[in-house]
Amino acid sequence: FAQLLNDLK
């Protein structure tokens, strides 16, 4: 689920 957090960055 790191993909979602990376998108916010």
From Swiss-Prot:
It catalyses: 3-methyl-2-oxobutanoate + acetyl-CoA + H2O = (2S)-2-isopropylmalate + CoA + H(+). One of its GO terms (molecular function) is 2-isopropylmalate synthase activity. One of its GO terms (biological process) is L-leucine biosynthetic process. The keyword Cell division does not apply. Disulfide bonds: none annotated. It is found in: Secreted, Cell wall. It is an enzyme of class 2 (transferase). Its EC number is 2.3.3.13. This is 2-isopropylmalate synthase. It comes from Cycas revoluta.
